[in-house]
Amino acid sequence: KADDLFRRLEIYVFGDPRYEGIYTDMLSKTYGCLRYVNKYRTVAVDFVKKYPFASFMDERHIDRSSALVKDGVEINAVFIGFGKTNRQIFLTSVANNQFITEGADGIEIKQVKYHIFDKNAAENNKNLNHTYYRFRTEMKNADKSEYLPMPQLPAQEFYHQTDINEVKFYDEIEKIVTAGANDVNFIVIAFGNDFENIDLAHKLIEKRREWGANVNIFVKIRREYDGISLFDGKECYVIGNESKCVYDIHTLKGSVLYNMARMRDEIYALEYMVTSEGRVPSEEDIERCRKDTYKAWFRDKLPLERESNLYCCLSLRSKLNMMGLDYCKKEEQGEALSEEEYAAIYAKDFPIDKSSYDRDVEGKKIIRYDLNFLPSLRTNLAVQEHLRWNSYMISKGMIPATIEQIKNEKDEKGKPTKGKNYRLRRHGNITTQEGLVKFRKIVARITSKSEEECDVIKYDYQIMDDAFWLLDKNGYKIVRK
């Protein structure tokens, strides 16, 4: 069959982001044999995967028992240059480097402060206005009574229209990175060619030493310079090597994030057979499910949905880091935690219920969720996951649906949309935890189902509840950081 052939055929297209819509339309008609690669997004994902901000934070900054950022800690990210690379790194970072802290009304986002330096007025950008800033602009004057509780803005941005040759350039950066003794600071350099970026990186390394500041420096270098040692040790991290993270076919084909995202999509379809249909999947069921979910991944899911699944897996390492853990390949150094040891850290105050179903699917125990989400590290990370998802959706230009749309909107087939309308770029779940409880009550009424059946909060638990299984199946282990 043609779709089976397409499943074995992979064609990678490295296209200009300006024409991404053309490739996206073609991709949906080829069952996944055509893969569009946006090099700027690939560089950004590689950066966030290798260097999540949480990996540079320790007990001075995060309470490992709760994953909450401590009082008196600020997280600052300085972007030097705001062209295609740094703009995409900013959006990918906003969608993944999300932290939580204790606020007046419970857990809330600990906003990262992004300081953007560019010689041009970088805040005036049609792409950002169409995507990331849509939520801020359109919701600012909206009647809040028509919506579920509004989520926070994902981050704070400060724009500095400054040339690197101006005297105030270093002065302004020094003020940012020396403001607090417990602050965590990041500088991402991507304003010019390789040599310009390298030169500024060396100057900032010297300045960091003079300032006595805690600053992690990253520099974009596109090419590999064989035999040349550009930096000593970890004084500066090189990002954006296109031959390794963009144009290497083995990296593209073997993407662990893609594999994990696809595996999660498949396993939850199989679990549905057990939890909703009450039957044990046969080998034929499993193979058919693999084919069906593979086709649906490319044919039915929008790029927004596929990337959402990918970013969920991308956030896994950051969440582990918040607990003082990490993951690495099984053959690498570091003593692996057992599943029991992982659960004792992650879920000791709110155990995972794996006993309600007497069978597993593909080696993964099926987890039972009710509506009793207890205060715990496990729950905090689920809250963080929803706040991260909110931020991802906002970064893509999505806005909340109104309560009226959640209650009454129907699609072309007459089915309730529950406020989810990708064509009009809105979603009923872009809200707070309180809003998600109200959402399930509304949906339970309009569908005549129980609240437990209509709950969506449980989905925010899944990535960490299933982390051990997911990493193990992909050749990785969980270790202490």
Language-model segment annotations:
Residues 1-288, 292-392, 397-414, 432-472, ...:
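Cytosolic regulatory regions of ion transport systems
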Residues 417-427, 431, 435:
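Basic/Trp-rich segment in TM-proximal cytosolic loops or flexible interdomain/linker regions
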